[in-house]
């Protein structure tokens, strides 16, 4: 029995399902989840000392690669001064200044401890600002596990085939309108009918929780116009895309400015963190300036701020995101060539250093329905074949993959060699 098998068996005694986040359980791909003990650069090392090229990257934060020495040094320096104060620090002021400089739509920002907190708080703020109750989200998009957002959500809920979670009261769900992603006409029609009741539209500008679905041309622009017309707050959930698809996030990449944005992952350099912010007139409604309450014991945690500040400064160097995107493109082109040679229906998507893999003969991946044409059983086999070849992909057919600046020629060679064998075995 492997160490991972032993640990997973032991974990199930006191941890529900043996994991602390559902997708880690390998339920959607089968087999025993890997337990990792070390990560460095583009690699993770499991408890049985097998090394893998990592395309999960802790689900996005590790854009520099794992254990970047400058980030570790920043955390060590802060450790000498304490773990948490529950009081303001200079680091959180530096972080706020840096985020607002990098993302022009951010006039004010509030730090929290997770992406779920960020989206939950942004929606509460939008409701408080507008005095309206309803929100619009999109089919297949995931914005964390708060009650009002677990309605036809993607990601873990999609993987398990549960459209909404037990424990979410119908009274919460009724205020959440779920529309098709990339369908701007559905948005216009809905707002024409109930726009005066809608506080906000929240959207992943690149839907990273039904694998990786970029916005259709005109979709984000259409959302901006529709929100302006009906006095609706536009929220971009950039927990995944923020600082990854471009330094200024997807809003800079696609040239569309939201009213509020949410961030996580990269902003903490691998530490637990989240943030939300945007227009000053909206953010001034947050306590203690305004009546909308939001608080957190660990918000602005100095360790997370130290790691995040160092990460953001390192990714600010000229050419960083071009290099990240170029590697991702080379890798996806190599996968496509090998799938085509093996006669395997296969489609890839990309937004900077973020990508999606679909076993489908669909011409393009644009909608939730396109995503659902993907052959999940074939992905399961591909996942394990790649794992055997030393490549760790997201253990779900509905999760985005991520590259880091630490991925280079050697990692590309390992990945494509493993893929060539995997596609051949899938015939």
UniProtKB/Swiss-Prot annotation:
Q: Name one GO molecular function term.
A: transaminase activity
Q: In which pathway does it act?
A: Porphyrin-containing compound metabolism; protoporphyrin-IX biosynthesis; 5-aminolevulinate from L-glutamyl-tRNA(Glu): step 2/2
UniProt GO BP: protoporphyrinogen IX biosynthetic process
List the EC numbers from the record: 5.4.3.8
- Spell out the subunit comment: Homodimer.
Question: Superkingdom of the source?
Answer: Bacteria
Q: Which Pfam families match?
A: Aminotran_3
InterPro entries reported for this sequence: 4pyrrol_synth_GluAld_NH2Trfase, Aminotrans_3, Aminotrans_3_PPA_site, PyrdxlP-dep_Trfase, PyrdxlP-dep_Trfase_major, PyrdxlP-dep_Trfase_small
Q: Which reaction does it catalyse?
A: (S)-4-amino-5-oxopentanoate = 5-aminolevulinate
Q: Which GO terms describe its cellular component?
A: cytoplasm
Tell me the protein family, please. Answer: Belongs to the class-III pyridoxal-phosphate-dependent aminotransferase family. HemL subfamily.
Q: List every position bearing N6-(pyridoxal phosphate)lysine.
A: 265
Which Gene3D superfamilies does UniProt cross-reference here?
Aspartate Aminotransferase, domain 1 (3.90.1150.10), Type I PLP-dependent aspartate aminotransferase-like (Major domain) (3.40.640.10)
User: Sorted alphabetically, which PROSITE patterns does this protein's record hold?
Assistant: AA_TRANSFER_CLASS_3 (PS00600)
Spell out the protein name for this chain.
Glutamate-1-semialdehyde 2,1-aminomutase
Q: Which gene encodes it?
A: hemL
Question: SUPFAM superfamilies given for it?
Answer: PLP-dependent transferases (SSF53383)
Its subcellular locations are: Cytoplasm
The record ties this protein, via PANTHER family, to: GLUTAMATE-1-SEMIALDEHYDE 2,1-AMINOMUTASE, GLUTAMATE-1-SEMIALDEHYDE 2,1-AMINOMUTASE 1, CHLOROPLASTIC-RELATED
| Provenance organism | Pseudomonas paraeruginosa (strain DSM 24068 / PA7) (Pseudomonas aeruginosa (strain PA7))
Q: List the keywords (alphabetical).
A: Cytoplasm, Isomerase, Porphyrin biosynthesis, Pyridoxal phosphate
Q: Which cofactor does it need?
A: pyridoxal 5'-phosphate
